[in-house]
Amino acid sequence: MKSSYNLRSIAAKVVGQVLDQGQSLSALLPIHQRDVSDKDRALLQELCFGVLRVLPQLEWCIQQLMAKPLTGKQRTLHYLIMVGIYQLHYTRIPPHAALAETVEGAVALKRPQLKGLINGVLRQFQRQQEELLQREATHSSHYLHPSWLLARIEHAYPNNWRGIVEANNQRPPMWLRVNRLHHTREAYLNLLMQGGIEAFPHTEYSDAIRLASPCAVDQLPGFSQGWATVQDASAQGCVYWLDPQDGEQILDLCAAPGGKTTHILEAAPKSHVLAVDVDETRLGRVKENLLRLQMHAEVKQGDGRYPDSWCEARVFDRILLDAPCSATGVIRRHPDIKWLRRDRDIEELVALQKEILDAIWPHLKTGGTMVYATCSILPQENTQQVTGFLSRHADAALVDTGTSEIPGIQILPHADSGDGFFYAKLVKN
């Protein structure tokens, strides 16, 4: 940790690295959090996530307040102003403290000559805040999504697109998966209650618990001993539909960071699991999760398009393919997705998913089950992908889950429920 730092300037740098360099917030934030005190880490996360969540609104306000935007080498100061406006409108930080710390951020960014400009813009926002936000509410920026994504969501869900967009813009709930090898869900709910943590069971998934308010993992009973895992309810649905059994050979493809790998082993502790991911670095997270839960799985680096290179002629009873996707179902959890994704990415991802599906299908035993899953809400990656797959593979059949008229199950993000997700359960005849 640095002995002296300005938190607002760090937040502005992080936002700039996401928007200008295309870096992932979830990869960047832990690096920068190491430079601040324990008490400031949560605030740094709040400022970075918050600015990226409401970015179009902040951009629109700055356009009204400044005749000329800050560009080039001064661009980070533009993001510093965003951090300032976000604090004034969305946080309980006393305005005088938010102003003072944000203005001082210009010094930390080696632009002390711009302190007066930043102070003036933020004070102007304070004076005009109510009128500005009333005007902004009628502007397209109010939806807080890029226009291409908004158009895709509206086209796919003409009757409820506004509800999806609204859910995307909310803070996500915190879900836990109770490790059934240690406790029943009811027993763990009692442990939470004894610790003063209010929580609610999921109506369908027997291991899932939603916390009334998010908390640090070190406050959770037995977290370090593997009694529970932080995992969204919709992600837990993957293993629910896979229905793994003891003694089976199971492939978890695109496995990182390992939440589903460990869930399989909780549901079927005597199964033989191979966890594969193309990203060697992220496979480290799989190993960390296995270690925390004291479980064993075979972990390999491998590209799903070329399974013969990492599993040769091996076949599996069950395959879970949580495919690379647009992640449009988890925007509320990763708001940088809105600004890192491009419209052209969707077709590229659809082609990649198709390639992996076709490549891995021969490695499923006859009579075996494959669950194809994404954290996307776009039909091209989900229902249309599955329909195309079934048309290419005569030995593939869709298992009727009795829950939907479409091929597969599409979950949409909802305030008190899970993230946006899609599952299709396929069997090889």
From Swiss-Prot:
KW S-adenosyl-L-methionine (keyword) present: yes
Single biological process term from Gene Ontology: rRNA base methylation
Subcellular location: Cytoplasm
Residues binding S-adenosyl-L-methionine: C254, A255, A256, P257, G258, G259, K260, D277, D303, D322
One Gene Ontology molecular-function label: RNA binding
Record-annotated active site: C375
Keyword vocabulary terms for this entry: Cytoplasm, Methyltransferase, RNA-binding, rRNA processing, S-adenosyl-L-methionine, Transferase
Family affiliation: Belongs to the class I-like SAM-binding methyltransferase superfamily. RsmB/NOP family.
Role description: Specifically methylates the cytosine at position 967 (m5C967) of 16S rRNA.
Name of the protein: Ribosomal RNA small subunit methyltransferase B
